[in-house]
UniProtKB/Swiss-Prot annotation:
InterPro entries: Cadherin-like_dom, Cadherin-like_sf, Cadherin_C, Cadherin_CBD, Cadherin_CS, Cadherin_N, Protocadherin/Cadherin-CA. It comes from Homo sapiens. The lineage of its organism: Eukaryota, Metazoa, Chordata, Craniata, Vertebrata. Glycans are attached at residues 419, 545. This is Protocadherin gamma-A5. Potential calcium-dependent cell-adhesion protein. May be involved in the establishment and maintenance of specific neuronal connections in the brain. Gene3D superfamilies: Cadherins (2.60.40.60). GO terms for biological process: cell adhesion; homophilic cell adhesion via plasma membrane adhesion molecules; nervous system development. Keywords: Calcium, Cell adhesion, Cell membrane, Glycoprotein, Membrane, Repeat, Signal, Transmembrane, Transmembrane helix. It is found in: Cell membrane. Residues 30-692 are extracellular.
Amino acid sequence: MASPPRGWGCGELLLPFMLLGTLCEPGSGQIRYSMPEELDKGSFVGNIAKDLGLEPQELAERGVRIVSRGRTQLFALNPRSGSLVTAGRIDREELCAQSPLCVVNFNILVENKMKIYGVEVEIIDINDNFPRFRDEELKVKVNENAAAGTRLVLPFARDADVGVNSLRSYQLSSNLHFSLDVVSGTDGQKYPELVLEQPLDREKETVHDLLLTALDGGDPVLSGTTHIRVTVLDANDNAPLFTPSEYSVSVPENIPVGTRLLMLTATDPDEGINGKLTYSFRNEEEKISETFQLDSNLGEISTLQSLDYEESRFYLMEVVAQDGGALVASAKVVVTVQDVNDNAPEVILTSLTSSISEDCLPGTVIALFSVHDGDSGENGEIACSIPRNLPFKLEKSVDNYYHLLTTRDLDREETSDYNITLTVMDHGTPPLSTESHIPLKVADVNDNPPNFPQASYSTSVTENNPRGVSIFSVTAHDPDSGDNARVTYSLAEDTFQGAPLSSYVSINSDTGVLYALRSFDYEQLRDLQLWVTASDSGNPPLSSNVSLSLFVLDQNDNTPEILYPALPTDGSTGVELAPRSAEPGYLVTKVVAVDKDSGQNAWLSYRLLKASEPGLFAVGLHTGEVRTARALLDRDALKQSLVVAVEDHGQPPLSATFTVTVAVADRIPDILADLGSIKTPIDPEDLDLTLYLVVAVAAVSCVFLAFVIVLLVLRLRRWHKSRLLQAEGSRLAGVPASHFVGVDGVRAFLQTYSHEVSLTADSRKSHLIFPQPNYADTLLSEESCEKSEPLLMSDKVDANKEERRVQQAPPNTDWRFSQAQRPGTSGSQNGDDTGTWPNNQFDTEMLQAMILASASEAADGSSTLGGGAGTMGLSARYGPQFTLQHVPDYRQNVYIPGSNATLTNAAGKRDGKAPAGGNGNKKKSGKKEKK
């Protein structure tokens, strides 16, 4: 068992503490406790009930009590708590005097079992005693003829405390004649002596008053003083003399009390009172005066009480012989006490390493200690040992010193600390042993990198996430400790879509939490591959990497986008054609839409939201096909408005609507003839729009008529050069003014009702589609039969005033569409489809004239919708077959059959050259009007 530290400071608040020993049968061991002195009555010493293996209430039931040995009862039992407590204040100095070890022994009797248990309580010293001189005033006499250097013996102070709390030094008040010299005796005691520094003159100063102060080594330092009165005497020639001047004697510690140890003898050659000697102890300690007795006349020393080797191995005394003339002589007396084996060995740690690095080499010294046994001979011979299962060994050094060394490599991650039990045993009979515990911590070395629990991670984040949102957390474990286990996280540098990954995701270096630095868009970014690095803070740092796959989950954040039919830029609705002869299920058009989302967020369904004629049309739920639900009747209006809704399957669903205008007619002339009779539901906004259109058409018509008049004047001046143009102008002059429509009116008509017609040779049904009108002033022409005639003549006046020639422009490939780019075909067609829309007033005039002529022919009933030479039948190359490709321009879908001429007004193509082809005859529509 290990005793607690024995150092106590004076004046501190001392808390009782207990050293719990091992409870065993009488004769095989004792219960040991330790406590500081001067505790209050009832202070806790130890849990005697626990050490006896009893409950507190069993103390009274079993008759447990303290058996005294005739001494004053110092301790008592508390029956309620089962504790051993003090019966009163215990003064160590009163109990054990100057003994270094103060132990109180008593027995505990358990009456019902008739068992006796030995108990030892060690009383630990505190600095509670001041150094004290025996007398408050000391009178010293000195001859006036004393030479410089004469020493006068002074009484030494006694300090009842032991160890560091005992006496340490002396101080003398300042004076001219004396100084203080402190002599250390062989027993370690400090003896003050007064040394004469200057000769004395009794006639000048008879008495010298000095103050001697004794100081101890406690904290705080305690002191005691005595007043020294030095009286100067007349000369005394001879001082007493001891022969020999030092005495020694050895006695066993168990000698009887009263045994005479030795006799001292001193001589003085003086006579009379100056030769009469008296013996006394100089600076006698209280322990000396209590242990030994000195006969003042004979100089005989005997024992007053028994000796204890463990309390004091030797006693050092100084005996003074003084004559009547105040001269003295002193002799040293050493009493050595012989040992009896009654002390267990002790371990004294000289040097201890509390922490050792785990990478230390085998043979590293951990501790240096010495062993000591208060006994002597075989009783003091000691053997040391430690447990064999530890990676340590003992190696003996000089004297009783030992080294504790490592025997193999240490691993902190396996064992972080050790508690090494050191056992020392003497060779006495019976042998005594002591155990001491040496704690040792293994300091960490950065030999383990951070470790991720998984080889890779994956996580997901929903798109449109807020910036700064936490998306994932990674944690790496480092089995090291301290800074070597402090892990920081970072992302490997990389780029994605031209931007660094650090602009997409950041990571908290301390927690490993990843944050989104931007709002992700599933349509732009679907996944990110990241590498997370975990680094410790060791030197050098170790690190490891783990991959993290970040997936962006789609949200329904995109409304369906309608690709076909496309809306015109002027705000009007697209127009589709349905013949009145169409049967139920006839495909009118197909609404094509896409959704940028994915999964069910992109699943689209179509429904008819509103119709001007309910029950006439139906929309395919999944195909978007607009079909007739019943046969068309004569009473059905020419213009039918359908509102088609396209909705996805997201949560919540998003939708888009599209208005389709269906023109019900078998022939294009029917459409032209019935334009004025189309009735639409009255809408306040439509009324305003109609008013604006009427005003615009009237204004444009006026401008157009003025232009025609100016043009006719110019043409009359060139009558001989433009017979064909003059004939065409004569036909236009015969048309009633009401048949003319302004340029903007024609353009609006074409944009609203531009269509494609698919005719088959074996069917009278025609499929007319009104695709999105396009906004450039170009019209594609195509050769659809063997004969062709120019549709438009362009003229240019050169410097030599040559005649204007009709030319056929080469194909314009600037906006040509290949066959693969077109939504679908329903008839034969040529691959070289070129043409341009008219973009000046003259071309517009000519186009208007031909449209009116075609309308007249259609009204005449002599030409079919397909048209031949000299008619303006509009043939379409596209039927109601569609693809998902968004076609932005449908101008090439309208052409004028029967002519291979290209409408053009490009400045660079009016060079007056003869056309390369197209020299067929052209019928004048004016003749048909006459018929």
